[in-house]
Amino acid sequence: VALAAPTTVLVRQHLETFRSRFEEAGIVVAGLSRLSSPAERKAVIAGLKDGSVQVVIGTGAVAGKTVAYKDLGLVIVDEEQRFGAADKAKLRTMGAKHVLTLSATPIPRTLQQALVGLQQLSIIATPPARRQPIRTTVTAFDEQLVRTALLRERARRGQSFVVVPRIEDMAGMADKLRALVPELQIRQAHGKMPASEIDEAMVAFAGGEGDVLLATNIIEAGLDVPRANTMIVWKADLFGLSQLHQLRGRV
């Protein structure tokens, strides 16, 4: 089985989940991305070739030229809309018997193929058990409302997201948040940070470090933060509809 995810953060999260769930079953799960050291990469590629690694999770690297599979039965493409056409073509032609693509906001071409019967389509319309519906409020920016929302989430031992449309908005919003809620720990993540720093910030936040994650829409790609139940989107009119839909999925 090969699972491809668009970001290294998502790869790391999938790795932790798969390893915890398949640990007792004796299934070997390995990772393959730009964060893998040369030695790790070499060992994983060798394991895939001889069959000792049964599941590999990575970015587009799982379809690399040097990667060969002993008996590839299933390719899973998570957040399919985040991959380019060339990347998806490579993933689909890896020789797997089955290909499963996952998306909360499918691109028109994929949706069209499913509707005309070229691809089988399954819709997951039932939320997980005990999952509460998302309440969405549209209002003008109100400092007191922001403070109340963030402190309320902290009081229930939860975490919050604050999302801005542009990297240029980060510094100003960070200053506002520090003035509004000086008692909260604020972490930041945006696309111009080094990849290792983005990974560290987002994985640490998902692990419970920090009260607020101030970020651009970089967080839309499937990051699972169980304790995060509040999101404030500043200047929501500058986001696309699919982006807002993906962002809502983070809480």
Place the predicted regions along the sequence by residue.
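Inter-lobe coupling/hinge segments of SF2-like helicase ATPases
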Residues: V1-V251
